[in-house]
A protein has these predicted regions:
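Alpha4-beta5-alpha5 "output face"
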Residues: 80, 101-105
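Two-component/phosphorelay signaling modules centered on CheY-like receiver
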Residues: 21-43
Length: 143
């Protein structure tokens, strides 16, 4: 039973940036289809900067815990420069306390362990998107 509910303005689409291998993109798209989320897929870290330059706005960024070389820091930097900054979900084969606390310290939202079920992915994306909306709403009221 899917209990994920997005609490966002019905006039605004929920957008997700997903840095995932090409062979997994179809599965992610299917797992998120019932949420009505618009997903922009990239398969290489360098492609994230191209999207950032276009000033695309995302509720959530789905990033792998491991990237070759220093790609992870570069991607994190690009994501951090997006305004507003999306909530970052990091996926990994295992979630250690060190990884989870490191992600939170860097300003990420959460870590999800793969392989994840449709329900697990939907729940994580929903919570992150709702957190994004709440944070942006608070920021708007603080101005």
């Amino acid at each position: 039973m899917n209990t994920a509910h997005l609490h966002v303005d019905k006039n605004r689409e929920v957008r997700l940036l997903a840095l995932v291998p090409v062979d997994v993109q179809g599965q992610i798209r299917r797992q998120l289809a019932s949420l009505g989320v618009t997903v922009d897929f990239v398969s290489k870290a360098a492609e994230v900067s191209q999207l950032a330059l276009r000033r695309n706005s995302y509720h959530v960024a789905l990033l792998p815990a491991v990237l070759p070389d220093n790609g992870w820091w570069s991607v994190w930097g690009e994501i951090a420069l997006l305004n507003p900054r999306p909530e970052v979900l990091v996926y990994a084969h295992s979630a250690t306390f060190k990884l989870w606390s490191g992600v939170l310290e860097m300003g990420g939202y959460d870590v999800i362990v793969e392989p994840f079920t449709e329900e697990e992915l939907q729940r994580a994306v929903t919570r992150a998107a709702n957190s994004f909306v709440e944070r942006c709403s608070r920021d708007d009221h603080d101005e």
